[in-house]
């Protein structure tokens, strides 16, 4: 995989170039880039190493679910380890370092661990260096080196020079997530006279709409934000809802200055917000699931929607030729978007040809292999090709050693609604066979779940679920108003 920047497109501001350091090298991006998108556009393929065997790691996702692109950001007392490059914004003067590698991620001597993997089984150090010797001297001799090898980034030992703040809020409605369903819900409730707080962990509102980068979606996002602001609602970006407690008390963390080159000295780095709403709407979206196949951790193997998101939002091509392995219709929109952007696309669909999305993709000339699944990625430091096999009606894979050339593999096993916040309240997820995922279970508290967080992945269905939630929230208030009259 060799990433590059498309000549046009994306939501970045190409009139505002930004230069930052990555492992001592100068890298250029643009305003609106994340660390991950800027590195991908600059052709950086290996950005990390695995914890134990130091296998090469690339960028896997485009959001907070990222597990491979973890960096140490800042210097000296301002050094922060294990920062997810997929959500961290770049700014002039930013210092970024790779982690868990020596001398660097491209040539890491720790990769020798892979050669002796049979001897490094889970918990090997407890068996190898403990007993049958008397006492613990043998273990104590090796413990230092084992502990030193553990972990990824290294935290600073200097005192943190930044300041932090805490704030308390009361509101009628707290909406978590500013995708299409979250925006639509917040606008309707605010225009109905409710005091609304809308929080979004990203630095821009829009959710999945940001990936498509078309005029209609951009107009919808702008209109929703404008209407919400005019109605008195509050929008908080770069803000993560991390905890849901008794009485609907919600904990938020707002990142205030990490994206600024020279923040004013009076600004705190982060603010811990404690919100006490009357009702909560969870529009936290869904996360794409990967697929299990050989070497699916190689640089260049990504979540399918992430490949499209880098193209649509950041104007970055993850490679020249992409294989999209999927088991559902949603991936076809991503494949068509990438094909229109100029990438060579081949879709592997584990299912037979039965759906409208499949037929539509065939009509526009997309290369599709039905009842075909990935078996193993070829290539040591990236994707050189993909071995594929046939999947029969019983789900058994039959490999025929067929190899397809590509430098990017996008994989998608469907989506899983983000149910963690409601789980904090003891609500158990419920399996839904129709969407092959866990959905939020029923709750007696004043909490509504909308959009992809409730298992609706079509944009119209997401907005319809928001309408239902708004009606449910406003119904008691309308009844009270009629009683007062």
Segments (PLM) and residue ranges:
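Residues forming the flavin
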Residues: 1-25, 29-485
